Curated annotation (Swiss-Prot):
Reaction(s) the record says it catalyses: UDP-N-acetyl-alpha-D-muramate + L-alanine + ATP = UDP-N-acetyl-alpha-D-muramoyl-L-alanine + ADP + phosphate + H(+)
EC number of this enzyme: 6.3.2.8
Main localisation: cytoplasm
Alphabetized GO MF terms: ATP binding; UDP-N-acetylmuramate-L-alanine ligase activity
Pfam families, alphabetized: Mur_ligase (PF01225), Mur_ligase_C (PF02875), Mur_ligase_M (PF08245)
GO aspect biological process, one term: cell division
Subcellular location: Cytoplasm
Leader peptide range in chain numbering: none
Protein name as it appears in the record: UDP-N-acetylmuramate--L-alanine ligase
Purpose: Cell wall formation.
Length: 466
């Protein structure tokens, strides 16, 4: 593997999951790698064992002798002394995704994009490949117990990458298979309009070479609109719309889903998933479609899907007392994701009382999607709304925007038991009161609500909640 005359590569933020995986791949490819991070630990120690030079903290001297500097999205470019020093010295400074795109040129790239379902579909494809005897390189934006984390640096030709549309990052990648799992309004701070977002996905599909393939879900109206604009071969999949790869006879019970796949005229019955929800059937169809393009035997693909055991924070059951009291933790933060997660709970656990505990993520998203959240949450038996998790935003820039906007929207949509609770301690106390047999507390959000879910589960395990 060569990157021109590049020999030494310095990585700012090397301890992050995505950056450490790139560092490991570069080391295995024979490059000299150095990197810095504010914190060091097990991940950076492992890289050091492989030959990386690791610096704790940032200093202009760390870039001395390097040919290129790579930085992650978590690093503020205009505030980092190493990046500033590199720019002054005329050393190229690039984002993680550009380096990843260059590395993909030496592999068979399988890139999974879409507004929703990226993480799960990427993990499903990785599981299928590994169960089929392949050794792929995998980078996922979540943690898989099957994979032993979020990244795998394999020896084989396949590179399976979760490809984020935020900040147009996925346009730096070089896929042979480009998978578009879903498409609707999101990241308007990057795109401004839905049309611009669709144009970005078309450009992503155009990154595929003439011998590659685009795989897309026709159950999404906006994807159906862009299909006539695709300039590459494509495969369609779906449940509701006619497609090349379809699912039928879907039966859901608790954490198990059984269905039939019909692919290009062939029928495969008894496909089993150990995760709930119609949305995961669509994710499985996406993975199966990719496997068919790779000419892997359908029987191996189905067996691989059966080995998929889920992702952390994707309907992760953190506690189950065997009498119906459950704590479930999910990353859902877009209305469609929330709707799919609540539906999975209601369909799979029909006898349970579903208590949705939702933490809105970003003030801008709360303002834009309040009504949609209302409809998505209204099917739950009871709804508790927490304060907005601000992430990169500041409350003073969004006067009057809070979780109560969502609570009111749930009531308008027909929700009967709805609370907006301010303050972490008050929320914790209310949640403890709901810990009764037959109740599923379904925590959803991309913020720190996950810590409340794990904390409550731990309290239940050690008997401190009665």
């Amino acid at each position: 593997m060569e990157l021109g005359k590049t020999r030494r590569i310095h990585i700012v933020g090397i301890g992050g999951a995505g950056m450490s995986a790139i560092a490991e791949l570069l080391l295995k490819s024979g490059f000299d790698v150095s990197g810095s991070d504010l914190q060091t630990g097990e991940v950076t120690d492992k890289l050091a064992e492989h030959g990386a030079i690791i610096y704790r903290g940032h200093s202009a001297g760390h870039i001395e002798g390097c040919d290129v500097v790579v930085y992650s999205s978590a690093v503020r470019k205009d505030e980092n002394v190493e990046i500033s020093a590199a720019e002054k010295a005329g050393i190229p400074v690039i984002k993680r995704d550009e380096m990843l795109g260059e590395l993909m040129r030496y592999k068979y790239g399988i890139c999974i994009s879409g507004t929703h379902g990226k993480t799960t579909t990427t993990a499903m494809i990785a599981t299928m490949l590994m169960e089929s005897g392949e050794s792929p390189t995998v980078m996922i934006g979540g943690v898989s117990d099957y994979l032993g984390g979020s990244t795998v640096v394999g020896e084989g030709k396949y590179m399976v990458i979760e490809s984020d549309e935020y900040d147009r990052a996925f346009l730096k990648l070089t896929p042979t298979i480009a998978l578009v799992n879903s498409l609707e309004s999101e990241h308007m701070d990057t795109y401004g309009t839905l049309e611009e977002l669709k144009n970005a996905f078309i450009a992503f599909a155009d990154k595929v070479p003439f011998y590659g393939r685009v795989i897309c879900c026709v159950d999404w109206p906006e994807i159906r609109k862009i299909i006539p604009m695709l300039n590459r071969r494509y495969t369609t999949f779906g449940i509701e719309e006619h497609a090349d790869v379809m699912a039928s006879d879907i039966v859901m019970e608790k954490n198990h889903t059984v269905f039939t796949i019909t692919a290009f005229g062939s029928r495969y019955e008894g496909v089993r998933l150990h995760v709930p929800g119609r949305h995961n059937v669509l994710n499985a169809l996406a993975a199966f479609s990719a496997g068919i393009e790779l000419e892997i035997a359908p029987e191996k693909l189905i067996a691989g899907l059966g080995c998929y055991s889920g992702m952390r924070r994707r309907f992760q059951i953190r506690y189950d007392n065997g009498r119906g009291l459950m704590i479930v933790d999910d990353y859902a933060h877009h209305p469609s994701e929330v709707k799919a997660t609540v539906s999975a709970a209601k369909n799979g656990w029909a006898d349970s009382r579903i208590i949705a505990v939702f933490q809105p993520h970003l003030f801008s998203r709360t303002l834009e999607f309040a009504d949609e959240y209302g409809w998505a949450l209204s099917r739950a038996d009871s709804v508790i709304i927490a304060e907005v998790y601000p992430s990169r935003e500041k409350a003073e820039n969004f006067s009057g925007v809070n979780g109560n906007l969502v609570a009111e929207a749930v009531r308008r949509a027909g929700g009967k038991h709805v609370e907006y609770i301010e303050g972490r301690e008050t929320l914790s106390g209310s949640l403890r009161e709901h810990c009764s047999d037959g109740n599923m507390l379904l925590f959803m959000g991309a913020g720190d609500i996950t810590h409340m879910a794990s904390g409550l589960a731990e309290e239940l395990r050690n008997g401190s909640v009665t």
